[in-house]
Amino acid sequence: MVGSGAPQRGSAAATASMRRRKPTSGAGGGGASGGAAGSMLQFYTDDAPGLKISPNVVLIMSIGFIAFVAVLHVMGKLYFVK
Protein backbone atom coordinates (compact mmCIF):
# COMPACT_ATOMS: atom_id res chain seq x y z
CA MET A 1 0.00 0.00 0.00
CA VAL A 2 2.98 2.30 -0.10
CA GLY A 3 2.45 3.47 -3.66
CA SER A 4 -1.36 3.78 -3.64
CA GLY A 5 -2.14 7.56 -3.96
CA ALA A 6 -4.80 7.68 -1.22
CA PRO A 7 -3.80 8.51 2.36
CA GLN A 8 -4.24 5.93 5.11
CA ARG A 9 -7.50 5.84 7.04
CA GLY A 10 -7.30 7.86 10.23
CA SER A 11 -4.25 9.85 9.18
CA ALA A 12 -4.12 13.63 9.23
CA ALA A 13 -4.07 13.75 5.43
CA ALA A 14 -7.22 11.64 5.21
CA THR A 15 -8.96 13.88 7.74
CA ALA A 16 -7.97 17.00 5.83
CA SER A 17 -9.25 15.56 2.56
CA MET A 18 -12.57 14.67 4.22
CA ARG A 19 -12.94 18.27 5.44
CA ARG A 20 -12.33 19.64 1.95
CA ARG A 21 -15.02 17.52 0.29
CA LYS A 22 -18.12 19.30 -0.88
CA PRO A 23 -21.50 17.74 -0.07
CA THR A 24 -23.00 16.13 -3.15
CA SER A 25 -26.60 16.06 -1.94
CA GLY A 26 -28.88 19.07 -1.72
CA ALA A 27 -29.38 18.69 2.05
CA GLY A 28 -26.04 20.07 3.15
CA GLY A 29 -25.73 23.06 0.90
CA GLY A 30 -28.25 25.70 2.05
CA GLY A 31 -27.76 29.18 3.36
CA ALA A 32 -27.77 30.33 6.96
CA SER A 33 -30.45 27.90 8.10
CA GLY A 34 -29.45 24.86 6.05
CA GLY A 35 -25.90 24.29 7.24
CA ALA A 36 -26.23 22.73 10.68
CA ALA A 37 -29.76 21.41 10.24
CA GLY A 38 -28.91 19.63 6.99
CA SER A 39 -25.93 17.86 8.47
CA MET A 40 -27.84 16.93 11.63
CA LEU A 41 -30.88 15.56 9.79
CA GLN A 42 -28.84 13.13 7.75
CA PHE A 43 -28.40 10.98 10.87
CA TYR A 44 -32.19 10.56 11.24
CA THR A 45 -33.07 8.74 8.03
CA ASP A 46 -35.89 6.23 7.80
CA ASP A 47 -33.66 3.41 6.58
CA ALA A 48 -31.25 3.66 9.54
CA PRO A 49 -31.15 0.56 11.74
CA GLY A 50 -32.02 0.70 15.41
CA LEU A 51 -34.49 2.56 17.59
CA LYS A 52 -36.09 5.72 16.27
CA ILE A 53 -36.26 8.00 19.32
CA SER A 54 -36.14 11.76 19.46
CA PRO A 55 -33.33 13.72 21.13
CA ASN A 56 -35.78 14.83 23.83
CA VAL A 57 -36.41 11.22 24.84
CA VAL A 58 -32.66 10.60 25.01
CA LEU A 59 -32.24 13.68 27.21
CA ILE A 60 -35.01 12.62 29.60
CA MET A 61 -33.69 9.06 29.81
CA SER A 62 -30.18 10.36 30.54
CA ILE A 63 -31.41 12.68 33.29
CA GLY A 64 -33.49 9.84 34.74
CA PHE A 65 -30.48 7.54 34.77
CA ILE A 66 -28.32 10.16 36.50
CA ALA A 67 -31.05 10.72 39.11
CA PHE A 68 -31.37 6.96 39.66
CA VAL A 69 -27.62 6.61 40.24
CA ALA A 70 -27.67 9.59 42.62
CA VAL A 71 -30.55 8.05 44.62
CA LEU A 72 -28.70 4.73 44.82
CA HIS A 73 -25.60 6.58 46.00
CA VAL A 74 -27.52 8.36 48.78
CA MET A 75 -29.28 5.14 49.81
CA GLY A 76 -25.94 3.37 50.00
CA LYS A 77 -24.49 6.11 52.18
CA LEU A 78 -27.49 6.01 54.53
CA TYR A 79 -27.45 2.23 54.71
CA PHE A 80 -23.81 2.08 55.86
CA VAL A 81 -24.35 4.80 58.50
CA LYS A 82 -26.75 2.62 60.53
From Swiss-Prot:
| An example Gene Ontology biological process | intracellular protein transport
Predominant subcellular localization, coarse grouping: endoplasmic reticulum
Where does the secretion signal sit in this chain?
none
The UniProt annotation puts the region (Disordered) at 1-34
Location of this chain's protein in the cell: Endoplasmic reticulum membrane
Q: Please list every transmembrane segment annotated in the UniProt record, as residue ranges.
A: 56-76
Q: Which residues lie on this side of the membrane: Cytoplasmic?
A: 1-55
Lineage top rank: taxon: Eukaryota
Alphabetical GO CC annotations of the entry are: endoplasmic reticulum membrane; Sec61 translocon complex
Q: Which UniProt keywords apply?
A: Acetylation, Endoplasmic reticulum, Membrane, Protein transport, Translocation, Transmembrane, Transmembrane helix, Transport
> What positions are modified (N-acetylmethionine)?
M1
Q: Which InterPro entries match?
A: Sec61-beta/Sbh, SecG/Sec61-beta/Sbh
* Record's function text: Necessary for protein translocation in the endoplasmic reticulum.
Subunit field text: Heterotrimeric complex composed of SEC61-alpha, SEC61-beta and SEC61-gamma.
Family label: Belongs to the SEC61-beta family.
Q: What protein am I looking at? A: Protein transport protein Sec61 subunit beta
Q: Which organism is it from?
A: Arabidopsis thaliana
